[in-house]
Each structure stands twice: as C-alpha cells, then as structure tokens.
C-alpha cells in the first residue's frame, strides 16, 4: 500500500480548491505507479549512457519484440494491428491551437485569469493551457495554473467579469490592427475553444508533493490527477472532451506507462477506458523511431501528434553528442524543411495516416508559430507574411492545423485553413513508413547551411535573456538576439523552455 502523501507548507489549506478530497484520493490511488515511472526514467538515462559509450546511433526496434508494458509486438504496431481512438467531435477541427499558461508569476487570481480569458476569447479552435514548458515553476505557479483553469471551466463569476473586460481590450486592439472587432458576443465566444491541458513530463518531480517517506512525487501524476479530477465532470457536462498533451515521451514503453496512468485514473473515477484523450508532442529523436509503437501503446487514448521544433532540434543534438562529426548549423537555418526536420515531419504525417485495425487514423497538428505582430509596420508585415507562408506550407503538407504562441496570431494564421475548408487531414494518403538503415540515417540528415559566429552569438544572447526570464517565473518570453535590439524590423519571438 502506498505511503500517505505529504503536501508542503500548509498548501492543502490555501489551495483546498485544487487539493480537493477527490483529487487527493486519486493521487493516493495512482501513487504506486510512481515506482514504475522512476524505473522508466532510470532506463532512459542508462540507454543514453550506453549509446554514448558505444558510439552507437539510434535505431529502429526489432519488429518481433514486445512493446514494454503491453502485449503488442512492434511489428503489429507498425501494421496497425491495435485499437486506436475515434476522433471526438470537438477535436475534429483544430485548425489553430493556441498555447500558454493560465497564470502569471506572483499574480493575484484576477490577473492570472486574464491569461485564460485571452485564450478562450481568441477564436482558436483549441487552447493548450500549459503546465510544462511555458509555465514558470517558481513559488505556487503550478497550483495557481490549476486553480485558474478550474474557475474558468466552471464559469466562475470572477472569471466572467475578467473575460468581459478582456474582450473589450482585445476588440480595441483588433480595431486598430484589422480595422474590425474579432469578438461579437464574448459569452458565446468563450464556448468556442476546446480546453486542453499539458502535463509535465515523466522526468520531473513535483515541488509541493512528496511520498510519505519524503521521496519525490511525479509531477506527471500530480498534474494528471489535479486537472482531470477537478474538471472532468464540468467538461463532460458541457459536452466537451477531456484532452491532454503529453510531453517529452521518448519511447513506446514510456507511452505505455502514460496509458496505464490514464486507464488507472479512468478506472478510479468510474469512467470508460479511453475517455481521456491525449495528443503527444514529438519532441524527441528517439520517439521518431517509434511513432507507430507509441500510437499503439496509448491505444484508445491517442488522438494525434504535434510536430515541435526547438525541443526536437535539441534532442537531435543530444542524441548525437557522442559524434564529433555531427554539428548543427545556425539555428535559424534549421527550419521544418531542413534535412532531418523534413524527414521528421514526413514520418509523423505518415504515422498518423496509417490506419489501425478499425480503419481509424489520427491527427497531425503542425508546429509552433512564434511570431507576434509587435514592431514596425514593415517588420510586422514581413513577419506575418512569413507566418502565413509557413502555415500554407504545413497545410499543403497535410497538417490538420498548427500552434500559435500568442492570441494575436489566431486571426492571422487561421484563414489559411478556413480558405481550404477541410476539417482535418484524415483520409489523405501518404506512402507507408519504412524501417530501413537508410530511413534511420535520414533522421539525422545534415544538409549544407551556415555555421557562423553570428549564429553562436544569437544562441548565447537568447540563452542569457531566457535565463533571466526563467529565474523570474516567465517561462514564456518574447526574445530576439541582442544584435537586433535596436532594429524594430526584426520581431520578437515567443519562446518557452524549449
């Protein structure tokens, strides 16, 4: 039997609306699975050390082996011999998903709720409220984030008051930028956007919870229980799905552990298996070697993949750190059409469009648009043209939609999918995935591109700026290299922990 949980600094009293009796019961029920989480993380580090010592690149799995934590063989997963999920109605059209936290550092509740109001009034088809990379991990921000989401999802009067004020401010900005308002009826607009939550990754411990013996407690389990338990009834009563984003998954074995956590929580709450839906961010090179296996391991919970950029570039560099011949070019040269990034995106779209045994495919949500329309007129025009061109490329490539890092970008990028009018990419046909040595080598394909001192300066400059923001709890910050501080034609980009 699991030890009782410890909650630090009397937070159970001050956050009684987050640490509810129901949520604490779920945390206690899932706590025994934290042992398996620690085992998976130890295996992750051991694999990395072993590969580096042997100077061995990543490879595809043996098709005859079982996916750890499942009864599914690798070859069966690749052939679609598993039961996937139907796409629920409120996820069938996700042309634009916004991202960002539901609070601010050291903010009163009403101030933090402004973040939620901007998100739900933005016109985005979905909004991923972030408990991970974009959320500061100082003080009680993780709990403030969850409190604000509960207030918004429940339609608390304080949230509605804030939303009315924010709607007026958003329309004032839109009148100046577009020449028209973007919100006709703010109450009705609040109902448009699908609510999505991103938990923290399996590698992290929570800062407020401990096991009874004083050892660290999984941040993933904490986020999963505190969000789902406190909000699932209100979401389902409103006809909404319970939707998560799962970050930093590296292997199908880790995905199987997530599946076990989701199923255990559903069982604890008396919900049918597969009630909780999950997107997976493909942020790790190793995961790109196991895309069908991860889909299969998550089974009826899995609805789609998202193709990120910054985390994935970093993971490629990390996986190849043992190889002195692997040197990335300047970061601005590593676009989604560059070498290994192009291969990565192509494998993701092939994986989601491989049907399961019931003929069901999954969704591909395109990558992040980090531009924000703040700067000189010429700079904004150029930045928005790049943003629209990038969205058009992803739509043609088969993405069901993409991410934006700021609410102001929703009405700039969403028309790309509106003009086409297709709800999603389901039904498009792409070549089947291959698992040859050449396909493996392509996942670290370098192509000619600049490697310059300026590129190094840019990275160092942005890292210093981000470190300063991070220390203040601003894990999502508008940044640009210092060499361009005086050039307003060069726009700031929204960046988070990636």
Name what the model sees in each region.
Residues 49:
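Catalytic domains of riboflavin
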Residues 3-33, 40, 52, 56-82, ...:
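Conserved alpha/beta-domain cores
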């Amino acid at each position: 039997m699991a030890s009782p949980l410890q909650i630090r600094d009397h937070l159970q009293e001050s956050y009684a609306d987050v640490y509810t009796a129901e949520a604490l019961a779920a945390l206690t029920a899932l706590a025994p699975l934290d042992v398996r989480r620690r085992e998976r993380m130890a295996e992750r580090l051991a694999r990395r050390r072993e590969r580096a010592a042997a100077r061995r690149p990543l490879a595809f799995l043996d098709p005859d082996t079982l996916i750890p934590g499942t009864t599914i063989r690798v070859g069966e997963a690749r052939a679609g011999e598993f039961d996937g999920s139907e796409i629920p109605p409120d996820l069938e059209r996700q042309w634009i998903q916004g991202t960002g936290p539901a609070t601010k550092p050291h903010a009163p509740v009403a101030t933090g709720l402004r973040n939620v109001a901007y998100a739900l009034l933005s016109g985005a088809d979905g909004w991923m409220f972030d408990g991970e990379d974009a959320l500061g991990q100082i003080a009680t921000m993780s709990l403030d984030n969850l409190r604000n989401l509960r207030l918004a999802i429940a339609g608390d009067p304080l949230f509605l008051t804030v939303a009315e004020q924010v709607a007026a401010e958003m329309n004032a900005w839109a009148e100046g930028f577009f020449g028209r308002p973007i919100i006709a009826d703010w109450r009705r607009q609040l109902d448009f956007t699908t609510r999505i939550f991103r938990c923290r990754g399996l590698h992290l411990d929570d800062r407020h919870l401990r096991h009874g013996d004083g050892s660290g407690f999984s941040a993933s389990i904490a986020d999963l229980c505190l969000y789902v338990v406190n909000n699932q009834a209100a979401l389902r009563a409103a006809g909404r799905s319970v939707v998560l984003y799962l970050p930093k998954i590296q292997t199908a074995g880790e995905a199987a552990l997530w599946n076990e956590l989701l199923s255990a929580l559903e069982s604890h709450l008396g919900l049918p298996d597969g009630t909780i839906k999950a997107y997976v961010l493909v942020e790790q090179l190793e995961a790109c070697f196991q895309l069908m296996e991860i889909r299969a391991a998550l089974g009826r919970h899995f609805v789609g993949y998202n193709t990120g950029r910054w985390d994935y570039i970093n993971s490629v560099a990390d996986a190849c750190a043992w190889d002195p011949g692997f040197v990335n070019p300047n970061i601005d040269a590593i676009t989604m059409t560059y070498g290994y990034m192009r291969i990565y995106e192509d494998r993701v779209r092939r994986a989601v469009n491989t049907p399961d045994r019931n003929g069901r495919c999954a969704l591909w949500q395109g990558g992040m648009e980090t531009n924000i329309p703040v700067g000189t007129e010429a700079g904004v025009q150029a930045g928005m043209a790049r943003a629209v061109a990038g969205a058009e490329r992803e739509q043609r490539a088969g993405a069901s939609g993409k991410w934006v890092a700021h609410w102001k970008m929703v009405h700039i990028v969403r028309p790309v999918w509106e003009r086409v009018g297709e709800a999603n990419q389901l039904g498009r046909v792409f070549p089947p995935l291959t698992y040859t040595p050449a396909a493996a080598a392509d996942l670290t394909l370098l192509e000619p591109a600049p490697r310059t001192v300026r590129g190094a300066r840019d990275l160092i400059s942005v890292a210093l700026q981000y470190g300063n923001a991070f220390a203040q709890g601003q894990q999502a910050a508008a940044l640009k290299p210092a060499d361009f501080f005086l050039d307003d034609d060069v726009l700031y980009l929204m960046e988070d922990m990636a």
